[in-house]
Amino acid sequence: MAASVEDEFEDAPDVEPLEPTLKNIIEQKSLKWIFVGGKGGVGKTTCSCSLAVQLAAVRESVLIISTDPAHNISDAFDQKFSKVPTKVKGYDNLFAMEIDPSLGVAELPDEFFEEDNMLSMGKKMMQEAMSAFPGIDEAMSYAEVMRLVKGMNFSVVVFDTAPTGHTLRLLNFPTIVERGLGRLMQIKNQISPFISQMCNMLGLGDMNADQLASKLEETLPVIRSVSEQFKDPEQTTFICVCIAEFLSLYETERLIQELAKCRIDTHNIIVNQLVFPDNERPCKMCEARHKIQSKYLDQMEDLYEDFHIVKLPLLPHEVRGADKVNTFSKQLLEPYSPPKK
């Protein structure tokens, strides 16, 4: 006699929840690109800097890039960073840089462009050409950053991303650039006189649309390579950071669905700023907050049972400076336990 559905469920083994840490990320040596993102104000920067610190302990060289115009990694490490990789104080193999992709190619340092006469004007001409295609200027700035980063051969790159909308544009930049360059190729003959005129006005000599197209096409192999790597779970993953509130949970679910559409791997969620009750010093506000957070935590554990869900506490102090980031980072590897009273 066939077993009933109820019997099958009774016989099925309980599914053990995945370890609530980021050890799986630290131990996956094949990872090249790690994105950390989520809604604004949830502690993405603290988490991404902490992850970079832990990676620096086991990887040869680590770069953390902020693509958030707020540039909070300078605040987190209490050290000023710029558009080029700079060594984090106290570390030999951890570097940081900050870019503002919304400024497009104008944001890139001159070091990104070659020195010879034809290409030294690349920055000015790319700004002029890209302005005709909405979105591609930002995408090209990502592309140039990727070209630089790949040339430096960092073991792993951590992205401290801007809030969700910017992040999705970052992940889609290869498609945007290829589409934009395709349109540029189609109209290059029409804009050739404009390009020549601009070069003469800038005192850069003769340059035609074919030369500009050639300059831009040099970036395409890097873009295609990065695009393939982004879609390879062995090389790329995305860590979602949120807090245990409705809007943050909603944004996280939307982000995970968009990542799936982009074929970007994600299997880790950090739930930050959790309040734990203090029996010795009861606080009605804290208890109410804990109750609300517990409700959303339960929902997350049901919804994301195939994710590593890391729980981090709300702290009574700021995490600022390399030492505090280092201390905080240890909680990514060991499940947090509230102090026993």
UniProtKB/Swiss-Prot annotation:
Changing residue 114 to P: No effect on interaction with GET4. No effect on tail-anchored protein delivery. It is an enzyme of class 3 (hydrolase). GO terms for biological process: post-translational protein targeting to endoplasmic reticulum membrane; synapse assembly; tail-anchored membrane protein insertion into ER membrane. Its main location: cytoplasm. It catalyses: ATP + H2O = ADP + phosphate + H(+). Its EC number is 3.6.4.-. InterPro entries: Anion-transp_ATPase-like_dom, ATPase_ArsA/GET3, ATPase_ArsA/GET3_euk, P-loop_NTPase. SUPFAM superfamilies: P-loop containing nucleoside triphosphate hydrolases. GO terms for molecular function: ATP binding; ATP hydrolysis activity; metal ion binding. Keywords: ATP-binding, Cytoplasm, Endoplasmic reticulum, Hydrolase, Metal-binding, Nucleotide-binding, Nucleus, Phosphoprotein, Transport, Zinc. Belongs to the arsA ATPase family. Homodimer. Component of the Golgi to ER traffic (GET) complex, which is composed of GET1/WRB, CAMLG/GET2 and GET3/TRC40. Within the complex, CAMLG and GET1 form a heterotetramer which is stabilized by phosphatidylinositol binding and which binds to the GET3 homodimer. Interacts with GET4. This is ATPase GET3. The lineage of its organism: Eukaryota, Metazoa, Chordata, Craniata, Vertebrata. The gene is get3.
